Amino acid sequence: MSEQQAQGAEAAVDLNNELKTRREKLAALREHGVAFPNDFRRDHTSDQLHADFDGKENEELEALNIEVCVAGRMMTRRIMGKASFVTLQDVGGRIQLYVARDDLPEGVYNEQFKKWDLGDILGARGKLFKTKTGELSIHCTELRLLTKALRPLPDKFHGLQDQEARYRQRYLDLIANDESRKTFKVRSQILAGIRQFMVGRGFMEVETPMMQVIPGGASARPFVTHHNALDLDMYLRIAPELYLKRLVVGGFERVFEINRNFRNEGISVRHNPEFTMMELYMAYADYKDLIELTESLFRTLAQDVLGTTQVPYGEETFDFGKPFEKLTMREAIKKYRPETDLADLDDFEKAKGIAQAVGIKVEKSWGLGRVVTEIFEEVAEAHLIQPTFITEYPAEVSPLARRNDENPEITDRFEFFIGGREIGNGFSELNDAEDQAQRFQDQVAAKDAGDDEAMFYDEDYVTALEHGLPPTAGLGIGIDRMVMLFTNSHTIRDVILFPAMRPVK
């Protein structure tokens, strides 16, 4: 047996012994009455106490004579004879408890408190004061065990370092890591901020089907499920777009939805098969209006959530305070591959040669528009660090977008990039039912030619368009990637509470 194996075996024995001891303590609690009481009520959280009283001196606190009730998990404990200090952690942070034997009912300190374990959940009542070092604390007059923890905190609360374990046991990660808790609080604030922003501009939040007979609204491989009652194969949605635009046809002129999408594709630092999107549709608007809305949304969220428009990310700092850069797809290719002759992008064979020169394998089903788009993604996308809008996407890769009036080979579409990543996609919507039907047919042909991500033909959606879709613009923003940027997170798993994981065998 290697030294590492021996250490692992020893750790397993230690853990089993601790689990046994904790269960014995729980059994003793059961014998003496209610083991999991539910009658303790707190009146403050730790962050409220720090916000209200950190600025006061101990003499002021003594004069105020403030009694508070708090509850949370015992993270540290220093026993010093007849008195102890405890760090209690709750949703707002941490607060220190001062626990003295003579200030508690008889027997509580020695017979109960000393037998409790780190990780146990406690309720405490007492007066606020400050220690000699100036730390806000609670001088306890009541201390109760509310929940007995049967398992120890990770590594005696030196932190949960194993990355896989952090994702699989997110509850331990949230207990052990301040940064993880902060990340998901920021995520919640971002979602609340988006809703406030959208409602303030007259948008109505709606919900559309998660299971669909025809998966539409994006080019992606769907998950397939089966509806037993209907005896029908269905798909987890890859996007809500076509249903949201049906609502615009029905007269809801400004709608948005924040919800999950599912795409049966690879997992990477940027991709999770289950992810959150915000999509909006706005009647009597075009893609330029949504460029302005997107810029305003990100600037507003940065200021409201983070308190600044200068957002650090790795070695970069994103500047949401100044106007965002705007480039056409071809301008971006030229900027980041200066030797490109833009005229060559009008000829399939020449464009194919450029694609192959930069390492792209050109598929037989691709047309010129797809080739040009692939070139852009290869040579330019990673360089789009500061907030940048890319416009003039080819019609071939934009089956739901309105064609440009001056050049029908491109569409009135943009994608929004930050940090070399696509964060949003928006366009003036195609509301010509006949054009939409033809593009669906082109997608069917591409699927028949082997493109697994090509769209299905949605006859009901075409019928809806035949009833008349007002001039409309639509936008989709990846919430997970947005949160990554705002929290300086470098993998999407760090911003999804429970990311997709392969089961442990």
From Swiss-Prot:
Cellular component per GO, a single term: cytosol
Cofactor note: Binds 3 Mg(2+) ions per subunit.
Compartment(s): Cytoplasm
Cofactor(s) for this UniProt protein: Mg(2+)
Gene3D superfamilies: Bira Bifunctional Protein, Domain 2, Nucleic acid-binding proteins
InterPro entries per UniProt: Aa-tRNA-synt_II, aa-tRNA-synth_II, aa-tRNA-synth_II/BPL/LPL, Lys-tRNA-ligase_II, Lys-tRNA-ligase_II_bac/euk, Lys-tRNA-ligase_II_N, Lys-tRNA-synth_II_C, NA-bd_OB-fold
Keyword field: Aminoacyl-tRNA synthetase, ATP-binding, Cytoplasm, Ligase, Magnesium, Metal-binding, Nucleotide-binding, Protein biosynthesis
Known catalytic reactions: tRNA(Lys) + L-lysine + ATP = L-lysyl-tRNA(Lys) + AMP + diphosphate
Residues involved in Mg(2+) 2 binding: 422
A GO term, aspect molecular function: lysine-tRNA ligase activity
Enzyme nomenclature, EC number: 6.1.1.6
GO biological-process terms attached to the record: lysyl-tRNA aminoacylation
Binding site for Mg(2+) 1: 415, 422
Main location: cytoplasm
Pfam families: tRNA-synt_2 (PF00152), tRNA_anti-codon (PF01336)
Record text on subunit structure and interactions: Homodimer.
Family in the record: Belongs to the class-II aminoacyl-tRNA synthetase family.
Protein name: Lysine--tRNA ligase
Protein species of origin: Cronobacter sakazakii (strain ATCC BAA-894) (Enterobacter sakazakii)
